[in-house]
Amino acid sequence: MSLTLRKLDSADAGFAAQLRQVLAFEASEDEAIDRAAAQILADVKVRGDAAVLETTLRFDRVEADSVAALELSPVVLQAALDGLEPTRRAALEAAAARVRAYHEKQKIECGTHSWEYAEADGTVLGQKVTPLDRVGIYVPGGKAAYPSSVLMNAIPARVAGVKEIIMVVPTPGGVRNELVLAAACIAGVDRVFTIGGAQAVGALAYGTETVPAVDKIVGPGNAYVAAAKRRVFGTVGIDMIAGPSEILVICDGTTDPDWVAMDLFSQAEHDELAQSILLCPDAGFIAQVEASIRRQLDDMPRKEVIAASLSGRGALIQVRDMDEACEIANDIAPEHLEISAENPRQWAERIRHAGAIFLGKYTSESLGDYCAGPNHVLPTSRTARFSSPLGVYDFIKRSSLIEVSEAGAQMLGEIASELAYGEGLQAHARSAEYRLQRTTTE
């Protein structure tokens, strides 16, 4: 099997350009895919259920008399949960409990409650926090079925207080993933439709005779789903358009190289475009990691995917020191950042941009993917510079509260009218002045 590992040195004159080449990734904007998604969305918007049925038959080879027949009842979800092998069910329930506990803590700590304060003249200002009414969760089907994603998308919505959670999941050839359905049961999903693709996004965004329109759509999907989510944004909210998975490992050379190699594999096995990078000041340790990669690769069931990912977008980078490693990490702004060092918190203080930070050699990224508790839906493609993990805050909205007292209207009215006249908006000014007149005449 062909495996070419790119090895860079930050001391080289051309390092900056080499790093940019490693990081270069433009999300595929295939015009044919975008046109196809647009056509499907337009069809669903006009014809509703009929369009959903036709596209589901065409793409998933599932024939149904009605969209209602594609909805799974709570009994079916419970049966999927009850049918799990006991240790698998226990693991799923334990993961769900940890994800729920973390997001309940997040709800308390992250400004998800209403607040207000009163000024001296009696004017009250504040903010009203309200959960979204209805959220749609897209869950990939077939080989890319991830029950952990059901937990990570549905549980924060439920903790936030979303009234209704609608899940869509394709079942190619009519084959259901029982673990995904069991996860939906545990996470508290209200309704599940076995539809997917752009047609499912359209059904959630616009609503059909059977599928209710939602306020926000979250969850990963293929290129057609991504194109559809881009197009319906504005009609509904979306979480993000995620790129390929990424891991960046900063290591001081004190971790077992086999552990580091497997951590790099953990993202490389997702797909050929996934990115795995190691930053380390110890050239000898980097050589040990490379040897471990080559030794362990043949034992991996997805070795072809891993090899393609590491050859195409991976890198082993020698840095001058750990300080420089942190600087480079901030520039990369990775989805997952492992700091595998003896004193990880010392270096974590220097990190400004990362979707999730995994501290210490015992904290493998895979623990965060499944059961640590924090959300595994993370910003990719350097968007961690301005974006955050999916959380409870993504399922709430904020309304400003303004209750002006009679005395407050006198003071604020003078300010507002002066500024409004300056902008040439006489009605704005007059509206404020009416309150002044009423206050002075009454």
UniProtKB/Swiss-Prot annotation:
Molecular function, one GO term: zinc ion binding
Any one Gene Ontology BP term: L-histidine biosynthetic process
Protein keywords: Amino-acid biosynthesis, Histidine biosynthesis, Metal-binding, NAD, Oxidoreductase, Zinc
UniProt enzyme class: oxidoreductase
Metabolic or biological pathway: Amino-acid biosynthesis; L-histidine biosynthesis; L-histidine from 5-phospho-alpha-D-ribose 1-diphosphate: step 9/9
Cofactor binding: number and manner: Binds 1 zinc ion per subunit.
Residues noted as binding NAD(+) in the record, renumbered to the chain: 138, 199, 222
A GO term from the CC aspect: cytosol
UniProt cross-references to InterPro entries, sorted A to Z: Ald_DH/histidinol_DH (IPR016161), Histidinol_DH_CS (IPR001692), Histidinol_DH_monofunct (IPR022695), Hstdl_DH (IPR012131)
Amino-acid biosynthesis recorded as keyword: yes
Cofactors named for this entry: Zn(2+)
Binding positions (Zn(2+)): 267, 270, 369, 428
Catalytic activity: L-histidinol + 2 NAD(+) + H2O = L-histidine + 2 NADH + 3 H(+)
Family: Belongs to the histidinol dehydrogenase family.
Biological function: Catalyzes the sequential NAD-dependent oxidations of L-histidinol to L-histidinaldehyde and then to L-histidine.
Protein name: Histidinol dehydrogenase
Organism: Ralstonia nicotianae (strain ATCC BAA-1114 / GMI1000)
